[in-house]
Curated annotation (Swiss-Prot):
It catalyses: pseudouridine(1915) in 23S rRNA + S-adenosyl-L-methionine = N(3)-methylpseudouridine(1915) in 23S rRNA + S-adenosyl-L-homocysteine + H(+). Its EC number is 2.1.1.177. Belongs to the RNA methyltransferase RlmH family. HAMAP family: 23SrRNA_methyltr_H (MF_00658). InterPro entries: Alpha/beta_knot_MTases (IPR029028), RlmH-like (IPR003742), tRNA_m1G_MTases_N (IPR029026). This is Ribosomal RNA large subunit methyltransferase H.
Amino acid sequence: MLNISHYKIIAIGKIRKKWIQEGIEMYLKRLPGLEVKEIKDSTQLKEEHTIKEIISKNEFLVTLNENGQSFTSKQLATKLLNSHNQNITFVIGGASGLTSSLNNLASWQLSLSPLTFPHEIARLLLIEQLYRAKTITQGGPYHKE
């Protein structure tokens, strides 16, 4: 079973749309222990500096990137389960994305889809997928095949 308390999300920018915030809050209630750290929009270099100050060396860093690796929900659940409860930090860039040097620091880069999403929706999708991965590993009824 996934231990969500080992996961953290660092996200650039605020959620401005109420319906997205409501969706995020719904899934966060189902994922107690998941930490979400919001960073103020700034230049990419300032955002990178702030992110580097937050992450520690023992964290497994995953950046969300349109060129990252794509998974099915079951594959993502398996990959997370096989991480052996490492401290995993997911980083979602703002409107301008993340710097290439920050992406290069990542242990792996994740693509949620070949489509491009606003960062607010990417945050909702990632949190939903973490919830889905948790239910897949628990054998719960949420994920349908």
